[in-house]
């Protein structure tokens, strides 16, 4: 590369070269005497231990990556104006790798640009469908990396929509993967995190803001992210062996009829992705497609869905250019750590490829599940783990002398022979063959930041079709086995029965290894038998001999002796996870505790074994969760409040369910739900034992008579009977009228809507820690403040703080009223109904105007007028009636509003907007909101739009309550948070 002439006036000046400069110069590097000085040696030592240095291409200096660009600008300005020769084009996988490393992509599409981006993507997809050549597919792979590329850090000169419009103009002008990459320098390896807990909490908070609840829980629990090290790279290479030389792929089946993909199938498949699902090498995330397919875009979204359907049809028909196969069916490779320290490779392929695979799987799922039969429980089978656990447990108890073997294949998904997979697909599921043939006949590229690995064997872990393809490859082995109990959950097999028969089946598995590419991992295989079985041990040298105390299957104990050790391990792991919850905000911590870390975390264990026999361990678990709850909320919970917190939200609690109370009903409900499937895999004598266990479990619940027989397979029917019993007990033992009124108010419909809101600061649905503490304390009747005098009126304030809600000078009244109306106005505008606040000309006799008026007719040609109010359920004037009549206060407030605005009802459609401080609303308000819900759903296409509006209204009430509480403590409360 020719650097061009160097201007003597700028770089050859002795005075400038002799002056210690911030940037290194050739003169400094070229002076031998200076290199020999102690200072120079110390600087060299610092360079050796500090950040990596990059050589300047125009001089002999070395600089940090951040400083090199500045050095070139200052010392070599003439280089910028000299035309540089175009470099030789790199392979597509290397260009994608560079774009992955250097081009950050927006996680969402800003609303202001969604229509433009959707039109551009539709044009690209139509070009792919029409031409189906390499340039059109390359444009599709480059689309997100160019159009949705984020600006440089610190670049605030343009708004985000302006950035995307500029990127879109560059893309239309021909910019592809190299767009803006030359201004960046590759980042080095990421250092390992110094605080795993803080990093996990940060990732969990981000995923929760994106709506991925399960992803947030996994991130908070996870310690399994592998660093970008040479050891991890070598382990990943070892996980992807080369193709065997004797591959023999089948021919394409004749007359493969594939039904055209509909737009409804496209929309359903896009909606099925997790909210924070990652992008593949091309940078296009499922969230991007969800934004661009929003019904709010109308015909633009419909055109995009049709174009996506056409491209999906191309892929399902197998007509993608062969040169694009390794890229389109490659993936971004992620390394995760297993519990034993080994590496688990996860392939995140392009969203378009995953979309086609999801649609193909939906069309062929029933045929595949029927073909695999009842013994393969890991593919498309509902409650597969529960079926396996119950069946194995019943067999072990019915046949105490039988032998049981658990089989585990080493690196199974990445080593199964692809020709075997394709033969099984061609023979049994020909509708999948064109797509599977595209994906797995040829090697594909697995792209990392610092390497590209060739995938030549197995199926990708991350491919929506991967589990089905692996199970199809394992099917010939599964149908050949003769043991009395044969269960498979993906690559984990369980054989039980006569020792000789089981030993013979193990030999069949070993014989199948050569034909399938699979290999058993003896160190993870287990043998359970009361007597030593030499034949089995000789077949599996190095396998473990398992005792009754540690016999488990799919995470469930198979013997009564194994229940307590497994519960103890669960307690240890849960304690570590609960310690991380306080690292989040209180609202996020409470949300995850209820959704993922209380009874939800124990759900599988409670449903697959009689854990109720270990009451002490379950009590210990409940105490652990209660301690985490009080830590998160910074709130003391008396026994009655703790009991109420263990109720579901719809029963007036917080949803922190007690595992001790639910253990028996969970087990009984699971046994009833899987009874029909268990009958297909168990021999008669074991099935009789299963039926006897089911009857005993149903009687053990104590509420069998209260659950109808047709609902005994539903866990909710069992748990509701228990929760209703506890709620009635709390109500009967409530010592004060205010407590009775509170308990009746909090279990009304919609009273707990705010607890279901996703706590996201970006959405404006997160409560700050103090507000959450007051709101939960009000709901549970727990003390939230010390007894004091109100700063506003001087009246005494009890420890429950209720005075702030009914104080004549309540600080929360006006902010709460404003937030309620702002929320409703935004909802009406989103539904396409413009409106105005406090309309003129509609004054009442007292000179006050209603809160709002729609500017277009709302129903039957009438304009809607509304006026809002929030009444205190526990106010002295209402509390006695509210203790016996739920909703008395809000119904009375609605009637008062109707009387006040009776004159308007002849010319307008009037509706009150009345809420209680404890969250419930009146019947007229419910009718009004129902009409808004339907219009919102039609306008947005989101069936959850109505519940989202109710959650925001409920949050507005709770924020006002918190301000009222704080107002008793200070004469100048903080301003309300108005999202």
Residue ranges of model-derived segments:
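C-terminal recognition-helix end and immediately following basic linker
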Residues: 47-54, 58, 64-85
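Surface-exposed loop/turn segments and immediately adjacent short secondary-structure elements
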Residues: 84-324, 341
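Extended C-terminal regions of large enzymes
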Residues: 89-92, 130, 144-217, 221, ...
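Conserved pre-catalytic core of RNA-dependent polymerases
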Residues: 192, 204-208, 252, 256-468, ...
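Catalytic palm active-site di-aspartate
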Residues: 280, 332-333, 344, 360, ...
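Catalytic palm subdomain of template-directed nucleic-acid polymerases
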Residues: 412-428, 489, 493-515, 812
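A conserved non-catalytic segment of reverse transcriptases
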Residues: 422, 455, 507, 511-608, ...
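Non-catalytic C-terminal interaction segments of nucleic acid-processing enzymes
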Residues: 702-789, 793-794, 811-812, 826, ...
């Amino acid at each position: 590369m020719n650097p061009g002439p160097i201007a003597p006036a700028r770089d050859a000046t002795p005075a400038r070269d002799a002056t210690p400069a911030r940037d290194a110069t050739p003169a400094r590097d070229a002076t031998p005497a200076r290199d020999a000085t102690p200072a120079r040696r110390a600087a060299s030592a610092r360079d050796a231990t500090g950040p990596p240095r990059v050589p300047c291409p125009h001089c002999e200096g070395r600089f940090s990556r951040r400083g090199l660009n500045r050095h070139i600008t200052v010392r070599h300005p003439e280089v910028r104006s000299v035309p540089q020769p175009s470099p030789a084009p790199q392979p597509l996988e290397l260009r994608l790798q560079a774009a992955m490393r250097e081009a950050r992509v927006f996680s969402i599409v800003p609303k202001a640009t969604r229509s433009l981006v959707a039109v551009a993507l539709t044009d690209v997809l139509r070009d792919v469908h029409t031409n189906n050549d390499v340039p059109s597919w390359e444009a599709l792979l480059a689309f997100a990396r160019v159009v949705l590329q984020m600006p440089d850090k610190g670049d605030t000169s343009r708004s985000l929509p302006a950035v995307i419009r500029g990127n879109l103009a560059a893309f239309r002008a021909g910019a592809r993967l190299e767009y803006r990459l030359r201004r960046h320098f590759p980042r080095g390896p990421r250092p390992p995190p110094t605080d795993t807990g803080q990093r996990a909490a940060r990732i969990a908070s981000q995923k929760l803001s994106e709506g991925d609840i399960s992803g947030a829980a996994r991130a908070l629990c996870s310690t399994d992210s592998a660093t970008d090290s040479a050891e991890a790279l070598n382990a990943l290479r070892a996980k992807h062996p080369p193709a065997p030389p004797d591959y023999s792929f089948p021919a394409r089946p004749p007359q493969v009829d594939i039904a055209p993909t509909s737009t409804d199938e496209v929309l359903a498949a896009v909606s099925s992705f997790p909210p924070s699902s990652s992008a593949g090498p091309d940078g296009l995330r499922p969230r991007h497609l969800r934004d661009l397919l929003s019904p709010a875009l109308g015909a633009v979204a419909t055109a995009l869905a049709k174009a996506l359907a056409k491209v999906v049809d191309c892929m399902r028909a197998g007509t993608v250019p062969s040169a694009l196969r390794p890229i389109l069916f490659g993936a971004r490779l992620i390394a995760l750590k297993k519990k034993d320290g080994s590496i688990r490779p996860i392939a995140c392929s392009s969203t378009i490829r995953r979309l086609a695979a999801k649609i193909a799987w939906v069309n062929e799922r029933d045929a595949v599940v029927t073909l695999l039969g009842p013994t393969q429980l890991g593919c498309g089978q509902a409650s597969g783990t529960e079926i396996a656990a119950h069946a194995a447990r019943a067999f072990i108890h019915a046949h105490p002398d039988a032998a049981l073997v658990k089989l585990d294949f080493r690196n199974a998904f990445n080593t199964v022979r692809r020709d075997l997979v394709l033969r099984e697909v061609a023979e049994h599921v020909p509708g999948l063959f064109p797509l599977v043939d595209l994906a797995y006949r040829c090697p594909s590229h697995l792209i990392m930041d610092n390497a590209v690995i060739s995938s030549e064997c197995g199926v990708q872990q991350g491919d929506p079709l991967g589990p089905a393809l692996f199970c199809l490859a394992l099917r010939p082995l599964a149908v050949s086995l003769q043991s009395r109990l044969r269960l498979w959950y993906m690559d984990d097999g369980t054989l039980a029965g006569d020792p000789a028969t089981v030993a013979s089946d193990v030999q069949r598995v070993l014989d199948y290894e050569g034909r399938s590419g699979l290999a058993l991992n003896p160190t993870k295989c287990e043998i359970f038998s009361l007597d030593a079985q030499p034949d089995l041990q000789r077949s599996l040298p190095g396998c473990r001999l398992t005792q009754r105390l540690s016999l488990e299957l799919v995470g469930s104990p198979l013997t009564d002796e194994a229940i307590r050790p497994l519960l103890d391990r669960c307690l240890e792991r849960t304690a570590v996870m609960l310690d991380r919850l306080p690292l989040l905000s209180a609202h996020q911590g409470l949300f995850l505790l209820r959704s993922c870390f209380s009874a939800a975390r124990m759900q599988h264990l409670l449903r697959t074994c009689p854990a109720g026999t270990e009451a002490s361990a379950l009590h210990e678990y409940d105490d652990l969760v209660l301690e985490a709850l009080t830590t998160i909320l910074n709130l003391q919970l008396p026994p009655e409040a703790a009991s109420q917190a263990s109720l579901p939200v719809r029963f007036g609690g917080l949803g922190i369910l007690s595992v001790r109370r639910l253990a028996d009903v969970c087990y009984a409900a699971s046994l009833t739900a899987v009874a029909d499937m268990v009958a297909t895999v168990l021999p008669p004598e074991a099935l009789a034992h299963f039926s006897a266990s089911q009857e005993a479990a149903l009687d053990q619940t104590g509420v069998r008579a209260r659950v109808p027989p047709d609902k005994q397979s539903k866990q909710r029917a069992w748990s509701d009977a228990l929760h209703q019993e506890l709620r009635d007990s709390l109500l009967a033992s409530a010592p004060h009228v205010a407590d009775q009124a509170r308990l009746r108010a909090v279990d009304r419909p919609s009273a707990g809507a705010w607890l279901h809101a996703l706590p996201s600061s970006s959405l404006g649905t997160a409560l700050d820690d103090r507000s959450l503490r007051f709101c939960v304390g009000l709901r549970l009747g727990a003390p939230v403040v010390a007894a004091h005098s109100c700063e506003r009126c001087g009246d005494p304030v009890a420890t429950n703080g209720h005075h702030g809600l009914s104080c004549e000078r309540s600080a929360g009244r006006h902010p709460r009223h404003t937030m309620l109306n702002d929320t409703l106005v935004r909802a009406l505008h989103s539904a396409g109904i413009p409106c105005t606040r406090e309309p003129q000309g509609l004054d009442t006799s007292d000179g006050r105007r209603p809160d709002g008026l729609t500017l277009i007719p709302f129903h039957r040609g009438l304009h809607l007028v509304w006026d809002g109010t929030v009444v205190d359920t526990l106010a002295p004037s209402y509390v006695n009636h509210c203790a016996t009549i739920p909703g008395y206060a809000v119904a009375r407030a609605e009637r008062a509003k109707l009387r006040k605005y009776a004159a308007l009802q002849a010319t307008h459609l009037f509706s009150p907007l009345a809420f209680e401080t404890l969250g419930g609303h009146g019947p007229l308000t419910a009718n009004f909101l129902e009409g808004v819900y339907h219009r919102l759903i039609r306008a947005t296409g989101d069936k959850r739009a109505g519940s989202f509006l109710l959650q925001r209204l409920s949050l507005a009430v709770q924020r006002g309550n918190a301000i009222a509480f704080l107002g008793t403590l200070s004469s100048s409360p903080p301003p309300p948070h108005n999202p």
